[in-house]
Design a protein with these regions (language model features):
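Mid-domain alpha/beta scaffold segments of enzyme catalytic cores
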Residues: 1-258
């Protein structure tokens, strides 16, 4: 019973084979998935998929690489789509200083606004941060985390940074990057954080874990992330899967609906 808390089954790479991907995931014990939409086409597809499959949920928001296109019309669109009963979070939102498709001040403004929306709507928010960890921290700290909390998606910082984010009310999510040989900082985080503060994800079709590194990632491969982190922590894969699934269901508000 594994919950992939961040996958992009809604992108073109998976078009026409979503059922196959969901079936393979089930074979490997991945029984719930959070489909993340980050622009209009992927948001629309995410909502179509969650309507079709009981075990799928959606997170929708405006990605930092799209921050330059955020308008009042886009915000109205998001507010409408966020009403969908299977939307469990707002995201992925944040800062991306790697691609810099929008100026820092524009990214910051859009990030802050969407954090505010998440709190207004009583939803957790999901954060994308790349080459921008310190600024991301300062913005979350100044805006504050609502009672539903937030998720640091595909975390790639140190234990010190992870603990700072956890103190703000965030939960740390690990993608296949944790399995990479040189990812020693991330492995330390996955080993040392309290069990109730961690989640697992794929970010499929990106960031495939070892032993599939370099290939297309698939939501089924959350299994490899679970296996790796459970070994790090000296516990069984079943124990880690149960704990991270319970964490996801709590954050997404699914524990009260079951």
């Amino acid at each position: 019973m594994i919950f992939d808390t961040h996958t992009h089954l809604n992108v073109e790479e998976f078009a026409g084979r979503e059922a196959e991907e969901i079936a393979l995931a089930a074979e490997m014990g991945v029984t719930q998935m959070n489909i993340v939409g980050f622009d209009q086409p992927t948001i629309e597809r995410a909502l179509e998929l969650v309507d079709e499959y009981d075990q799928l949920y959606a997170t929708i928001g405006w990605h930092p690489t799209e921050a330059g296109t955020y308008t009042e019309e886009i915000e109205a669109y998001l507010l409408d789509k966020l009403k969908h009963p299977k939307v469990v979070a707002l995201g992925e939102i944040g800062l991306d200083y790697h691609w810099m498709t929008a100026p820092k001040e524009v990214q910051e403004q859009v990030f802050r606004r969407q954090i505010q929306l998440s709190k207004d709507l009583d939803l957790p928010f999901v954060v994308h941060t790349r080459d921008a960890l310190e600024d991301t921290y300062e913005i979350i700290k100044s805006e504050g985390v609502g009672p539903r909390g937030g998720i640091m998606h595909s975390f790639s910082g140190t234990l010190e940074w992870a603990e700072k984010f956890v103190e703000l009310g965030m939960t740390i999510s690990f993608s296949g990057v944790v399995t990479f040989k040189k990812a020693t900082d991330i492995q330390e985080v996955a080993k040392e954080l309290p069990l109730d503060k961690i989640l697992v994800e794929t970010d499929a079709p990106y960031l495939a874990p070892v032993p599939k590194r370099g290939r297309e990632n698939r939501t089924a491969y959350t299994r490899y992330v679970v296996d790796f982190i459970s070994d790090l922590r000296g516990m069984t894969a079943e124990e880690l899967a149960a704990a991270t699934t319970a964490n996801a269901e709590r954050i997404f508000g699914l524990d009260s609906k079951q």
